Amino acid sequence: MNMSLSRIVKAAPLRRTTLAMALGALGAAPAAHADWNNQSIVKTGERQHGIHIQGSDPGGVRTASGTTIKVSGRQAQGILLENPAAELQFRNGSVTSSGQLSDDGIRRFLGTVTVKAGKLVADHATLANVGDTWDDDGIALYVAGEQAQASIADSTLQGAGGVQIERGANVTVQRSAIVDGGLHIGALQSLQPEDLPPSRVVLRDTNVTAVPASGAPAAVSVLGASELTLDGGHITGGRAAGVAAMQGAVVHLQRATIRRGDAPAGGAVPGGAVPGGAVPGGFGPGGFGPVLDGWYGVDVSGSSVELAQSIVEAPELGAAIRVGRGARVTVSGGSLSAPHGNVIETGGARRFAPQAAPLSITLQAGAHAQGKALLYRVLPEPVKLTLTGGADAQGDIVATELPSIPGTSIGPLDVALASQARWTGATRAVDSLSIDNATWVMTDNSNVGALRLASDGSVDFQQPAEAGRFKVLTVNTLAGSGLFRMNVFADLGLSDKLVVMQDASGQHRLWVRNSGSEPASANTLLLVQTPLGSAATFTLANKDGKVDIGTYRYRLAANGNGQWSLVGAKAPPAPKPAPQPGPQPPQPPQPQPEAPAPQPPAGRELSAAANAAVNTGGVGLASTLWYAESNALSKRLGELRLNPDAGGAWGRGFAQRQQLDNRAGRRFDQKVAGFELGADHAVAVAGGRWHLGGLAGYTRGDRGFTGDGGGHTDSVHVGGYATYIADSGFYLDATLRASRLENDFKVAGSDGYAVKGKYRTHGVGASLEAGRRFTHADGWFLEPQAELAVFRAGGGAYRAANGLRVRDEGGSSVLGRLGLEVGKRIELAGGRQVQPYIKASVLQEFDGAGTVHTNGIAHRTELRGTRAELGLGMAAALGRGHSLYASYEYSKGPKLAMPWTFHAGYRYSW
């Protein structure tokens, strides 16, 4: 035969393609050939390989660029590399096989391209097995042996059997696609693992797919201490899992996306995943275990898997990650999603891991997990779940009733939250839970064996969407130092509760969310129950150590029997100029309204919302705004005597600071500012003249509630006036004014959250002022004054943002004033005049009372009392009908003080 080939070579310069086909038909290439470039190789027949580099062939680098290989026939392989010293570089070509690679059902683990020794470098290539299924070893690339290597780039590897790497092989795949049958690394070890050396595979920016038709149990399987590193890419499909790692495998996945794909998984069970019914099994070539119920993004048993900045999405039937005996999973960043199933589930191939090997799962570096259950436990092995580094996980932690197996024990389920991690869910399955600078948002009643908190670790009883759905946390032991955020349902007499069954220690704080509803009775609200004699202490973390509930504030108190409850807080004595009673005495009874209404208990401190509602309502606030708008004649019209017999138009602005104590709410300050515009017509009559006019204005009052927040009122008013000035010095001024007031407030409750309230009301008032000026020849004058004003404020009803019900009944004010003004008229050149003055008045509020109800509890506000007022001002006639006026006032009383009031105005007379 060799002589025949020698003669052919010497006889004629045959074309390379024809010669290659002839040599391929004999099963081996001659040593004289170093490459197969730009060829089309077609083979048919048993074991007819397209390119076959045997161990006896010379080593070195060989190339096949731009080459197409097609083979068909039993166990025919497009490329078979068996020489450890050889390297085949296959670029810009394709290899296709369509023959049966198995032998009467006996697996031979052959591929369209097989590397048993040596190195394959494939670039921009297509390797396709188009004739077989997973069960018949339809493998596109098979690399096996410690002397076998492959480096694939920018290529497509397609076959129902996928890509198989085992027995110590090393493979690198970049920017490529492995389609149909997935990627499978390693094999199950025997009892002597050293018999099967681990393989190592590196994928970079490579997608792996296992379609249902291929029958591949997993899109990627890593077995028997083999190692996979993937950086970038999508893993899709698999009958039962996206990635399976078993028996000592090591998997590193970075920037990966793992999902099932559109087609249903072959192992899916209609009606939902059945974790408790999972059958132990595994994945890999050969179908060495039954397919499990549901689909798992990552299935780990006796192996280590690291996911970094990766996405795992589980369908309705399945879990994002399943962990079996001895599994170690670390998730750094990225997300795990199982909206209708379990994020993490225990189960899998127990027989391929050491007996009672613990399971460890860590979510860190901002990893996010979300599912109906965060962890579903069905194995008795010890489980440790750790959330740290800002990880955020949602879902319950649950367990099936684990069977009792003779000679074995059920290991603990331990959970650790640390470093700003957050878990949202409920549990009755956790044996120990530690929370260190992290948060557990408890969504339902829960039971924990041992709870330990540190570094402001907190348990947040989730605010319910439905009132009355309170929650109870029951623990055997409590230790450390932490924070519990709780809810109360005062109108139902219910609250969240912490119950410690065996031992409680440490210093803990309770933060209670505000409630706008009123307690159903005077009974206390129980928050914590500890065993009698426990060393644990509890304090309120709310502002000032008090909780706003409905109308009043509450504090935390222990009753000596291990119970910690909310009880009514006494109001601190407010600094007032009037004599104050001793600490916490019974206060005199308040006047009863006409209709019976609950009265506030003596000495109780109002909540922030109730205090704001009381101070915003009633007649007191509205009347002080109305009087700021009204004020005296001289500040409204200037000095009419400076321009006799003349009508005109005018405008004025004013600003005032008020300090109010209505005896129902806490003292507060209000700053008032506004303006008025008006015009009048002068009508001469015998002995004097009338000024008849109209006015309109806007006023804003800004309130500050010390330590709570504030509010404001916008007032728009219109009115008319009639002023009579007699030649004898007597004057009479009458006004009628109607106002519309828009009131609101925004305060911070004791829990730090804002509470808002607003409503609209109206007011109407009238005033009558009279006086007489006595003038001296040198310009000095003396003017006694008297004024009576009546104002009626309407009411309103509304509900604050926290649910506090408020009803303002409005009220009436009757204010009298007696004053004396002293000044001097100074004549200037050009007919101009200046008239400075000083004034002193005494004011008496005869009524000023109103009632504000919060949750049906009546609070009577009143500003009745006397105050003094001092002022100075100046009016100036500038000639040609122009005049200016300005004033300053100071007023002081026990319930209403005005440290400063400024007015300035201008009038033009014609």
UniProtKB/Swiss-Prot annotation:
<dbReference type="GO" id="GO:0042597">
    <property type="term" value="C:periplasmic space"/>
</dbReference>
<dbReference type="GO" id="GO:0005576">
    <property type="term" value="C:extracellular region"/>
</dbReference>
<feature type="region of interest" description="Disordered">
    <location>
        <begin position="565"/>
        <end position="605"/>
    </location>
</feature>
<protein>
    <recommendedName>
        <fullName>Pertactin autotransporter</fullName>
    </recommendedName>
</protein>
<keyword id="KW-1134">Transmembrane beta strand</keyword>
<dbReference type="InterPro" id="IPR003991">
    <property type="entry name" value="Pertactin_virulence_factor"/>
</dbReference>
<keyword id="KW-0677">Repeat</keyword>
<feature type="region of interest" description="5 X 3 AA tandem repeats of P-Q-P">
    <location>
        <begin position="579"/>
        <end position="593"/>
    </location>
</feature>
<dbReference type="InterPro" id="IPR012332">
    <property type="entry name" value="Autotransporter_pectin_lyase_C"/>
</dbReference>
<dbReference type="InterPro" id="IPR051551">
    <property type="entry name" value="Autotransporter_adhesion"/>
</dbReference>
<keyword id="KW-0574">Periplasm</keyword>
<dbReference type="GO" id="GO:0007155">
    <property type="term" value="P:cell adhesion"/>
</dbReference>
<feature type="compositionally biased region" description="Pro residues">
    <location>
        <begin position="572"/>
        <end position="601"/>
    </location>
</feature>
<dbReference type="InterPro" id="IPR011050">
    <property type="entry name" value="Pectin_lyase_fold/virulence"/>
</dbReference>
<feature type="repeat" description="2">
    <location>
        <begin position="271"/>
        <end position="275"/>
    </location>
</feature>
<feature type="repeat" description="5; approximate">
    <location>
        <begin position="286"/>
        <end position="290"/>
    </location>
</feature>
<keyword id="KW-0964">Secreted</keyword>
<comment type="function">
    <text>Agglutinogen that binds to eukaryotic cells; a process mediated by the R-G-D sequence. Pertactin may have a role in bacterial adhesion, and thus play a role in virulence. May contribute to the disease state of whooping cough.</text>
</comment>
<keyword id="KW-0812">Transmembrane</keyword>
<keyword id="KW-0130">Cell adhesion</keyword>
<feature type="domain" description="Autotransporter">
    <location>
        <begin position="642"/>
        <end position="910"/>
    </location>
</feature>
<dbReference type="Pfam" id="PF03797">
    <property type="entry name" value="Autotransporter"/>
</dbReference>
<dbReference type="GO" id="GO:0009986">
    <property type="term" value="C:cell surface"/>
</dbReference>
<dbReference type="Pfam" id="PF03212">
    <property type="entry name" value="Pertactin"/>
</dbReference>
<feature type="repeat" description="3">
    <location>
        <begin position="276"/>
        <end position="280"/>
    </location>
</feature>
<dbReference type="InterPro" id="IPR004899">
    <property type="entry name" value="Pertactin_central"/>
</dbReference>
<feature type="region of interest" description="5 X 5 AA tandem repeats of G-G-A-V-P">
    <location>
        <begin position="266"/>
        <end position="290"/>
    </location>
</feature>
<comment type="subunit">
    <text>Monomer.</text>
</comment>
<keyword id="KW-0472">Membrane</keyword>
<keyword id="KW-0732">Signal</keyword>
<dbReference type="InterPro" id="IPR003992">
    <property type="entry name" value="Pertactin"/>
</dbReference>
<dbReference type="InterPro" id="IPR006315">
    <property type="entry name" value="OM_autotransptr_brl_dom"/>
</dbReference>
<feature type="repeat" description="4; approximate">
    <location>
        <begin position="281"/>
        <end position="285"/>
    </location>
</feature>
<keyword id="KW-0998">Cell outer membrane</keyword>
<dbReference type="GO" id="GO:0009279">
    <property type="term" value="C:cell outer membrane"/>
</dbReference>
<feature type="site" description="Cleavage">
    <location>
        <begin position="631"/>
        <end position="632"/>
    </location>
</feature>
<keyword id="KW-0843">Virulence</keyword>
<feature type="signal peptide">
    <location>
        <begin position="1"/>
        <end position="34"/>
    </location>
</feature>
<dbReference type="InterPro" id="IPR005546">
    <property type="entry name" value="Autotransporte_beta"/>
</dbReference>
<feature type="short sequence motif" description="Cell attachment site; involved in adhesion to various eukaryotic cell lines">
    <location>
        <begin position="260"/>
        <end position="262"/>
    </location>
</feature>
<feature type="repeat" description="1">
    <location>
        <begin position="266"/>
        <end position="270"/>
    </location>
</feature>
<dbReference type="InterPro" id="IPR036709">
    <property type="entry name" value="Autotransporte_beta_dom_sf"/>
</dbReference>
